[in-house]
């Protein structure tokens, strides 16, 4: 079992640490690495890919520049996308500068929570997540304004939808990798049969 983290921008090391801990918690050893993905060759053998937050227009440009657009679209593993990663997963982002992957049929509102100084933390209820509410860190995040074609809504705030999943993909407007709560990472891995 190998997990890749798109290492073009964002909190890459935090995603690596969170997925490493989640894999160990699920009984996987050092033989199940979490690696940085910078080019198409790095995706080989990965069962999952995390797309971190950052700035969505920049990440989409770097995905194109590094030849990763088609390989990620064709990737057969699961994708765990946070913040800007959620934007890249959507079919409709409302900004022509963002070359989205279009893997989840949904519309997102970029920066729905405002500027960086308006970042906040909140306890949210996530559908089907045992153990009570989830403490979520929102940093200038998006919201989903419309989910279509089997995209399942997992969580909402008063601003809109902040967590979705469909099949092997999960997209979150917040940053679960910044807290110690691994339940969403574990749920994602479990959905992949890991």
Curated annotation (Swiss-Prot):
EC number(s) reported in the record: 4.3.3.6, 3.5.1.2
Residues forming coiled coils: none
Pathway the protein takes part in: Cofactor biosynthesis; pyridoxal 5'-phosphate biosynthesis
Membrane-spanning intervals of the chain: none
Chemical reaction(s) catalysed: aldehydo-D-ribose 5-phosphate + D-glyceraldehyde 3-phosphate + L-glutamine = pyridoxal 5'-phosphate + L-glutamate + phosphate + 3 H2O + H(+); L-glutamine + H2O = L-glutamate + NH4(+)
Record-level GO BP terms: glutamine catabolic process; pyridoxal phosphate biosynthetic process; pyridoxine metabolic process
GO cellular component: cytosol; glutaminase complex
Location of the active site: 83 (nucleophile), 175 (charge relay system), 177 (charge relay system)
GO molecular function, one term: glutaminase activity
Cystine residue pairs: none
Keywords from the UniProt entry: Glutamine amidotransferase, Hydrolase, Lyase, Pyridoxal phosphate
Entry-linked Pfam families: SNO (PF01174)
PROSITE patterns linked: PDXT_SNO_1, PDXT_SNO_2
Positions with a binding annotation for L-glutamine: 54-56, 110, 139-140
Family that this chain belongs to: Belongs to the glutaminase PdxT/SNO family.
Role played: Catalyzes the hydrolysis of glutamine to glutamate and ammonia as part of the biosynthesis of pyridoxal 5'-phosphate. The resulting ammonia molecule is channeled to the active site of PdxS.
Subunit architecture: In the presence of PdxS, forms a dodecamer of heterodimers. Only shows activity in the heterodimer.
Name of protein: Pyridoxal 5'-phosphate synthase subunit PdxT
Organism for this UniProt entry: Methanoregula boonei (strain DSM 21154 / JCM 14090 / 6A8)
Primary gene name: pdxT
């Amino acid at each position: 079992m190998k997990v890749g983290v798109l290492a073009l921008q964002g909190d890459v090391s935090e995603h690596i640490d969170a997925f490493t801990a989640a894999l160990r918690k699920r009984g996987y050893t050092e033989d199940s690495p979490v690696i940085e993905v910078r080019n198409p060759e790095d995706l080989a053998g990965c069962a999952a890919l995390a797309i971190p937050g950052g700035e969505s227009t920049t990440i989409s440009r770097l995905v194109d520049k590094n030849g990763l657009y088609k390989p990620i679209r064709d990737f057969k593993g699961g994708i765990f996308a946070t913040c800007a990663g959620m934007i890249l997963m959507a079919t409709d982002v409302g900004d022509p500068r963002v070359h989205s992957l279009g893997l989840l049929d949904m519309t997102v509102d970029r920066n729905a929570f405002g500027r960086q100084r308006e970042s906040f933390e909140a306890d949210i209820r996530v559908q089907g997540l045992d153990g009570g509410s989830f403490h979520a860190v929102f940093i200038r995040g998006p919201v989903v304004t419309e989910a279509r074609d089997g995209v399942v809504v997992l969580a909402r705030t008063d601003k809109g939808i902040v967590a979705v999943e469909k099949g092997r993909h999960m997209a979150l407007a917040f940053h679960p990798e910044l807290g110690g709560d691994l339940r969403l990472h574990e749920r994602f891995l479990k959905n992949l049969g890991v």
